[in-house]
Amino acid sequence: MSSRREIRWGIAHIYASQNNTLLTISDLTGAEIISRASGGMVVKADREKSSPYAAMLAANKAASDALEKGIMALHIKVRAPGGYGSKTPGPGAQPAIRALARAGFIIGRIEDVTPIPHDTIRRPGGRRGRRV
């Protein structure tokens, strides 16, 4: 009998737009959310929500909650707005990943799950565009 403890895995969902960075840590099925944090929860000024520093603080907050609940290893899913929005993650994605790695998690795989259309998307505003 080995006395080795089972490593509990989780998934870190990072949504990084130009305006904010949202972090959600869930179990492997994605059904149970273990911890949540965002750039807007950790800074006072609205203009700092999207900053790399806010993303780092949010990742540290989510990481400490997840470590308390026994998650020891993470798979990371990074997402940009996608669709008719930006297809590249915002400025907070890289610092959030780095902060999770420094928090002591074992990092499994990192994948990009940005929704990318295969034909085209009809932009909002209708045929004649947005009238200002």
UniProtKB/Swiss-Prot annotation:
Please verify whether the record's keywords include rRNA-binding.
yes
Which branch of life, at top level?
Archaea
User: Record's Gene Ontology CC terms?
Assistant: cytosolic small ribosomal subunit
Which key words are in the record?
Answer: Ribonucleoprotein, Ribosomal protein, RNA-binding, rRNA-binding
The question of whether Transcription regulation is a record keyword is answered with no
GO terms for biological process, alphabetical = translation
A single GO molecular-function term is: rRNA binding
Output the Gene3D superfamilies linked to this UniProt entry. Ribosomal protein S11
What the record says about family reads: Belongs to the universal ribosomal protein uS11 family.
Q: What does the annotation say about its assembly with partners?
A: Part of the 30S ribosomal subunit.
Q: What does this protein do?
A: Located on the platform of the 30S subunit.
NCBIfam families noted in UniProt:
arch_S11P, PRK09607.1
Tell me what this protein is called. Answer: Small ribosomal subunit protein uS11
Organism of this sequence = Saccharolobus solfataricus (strain ATCC 35092 / DSM 1617 / JCM 11322 / P2)
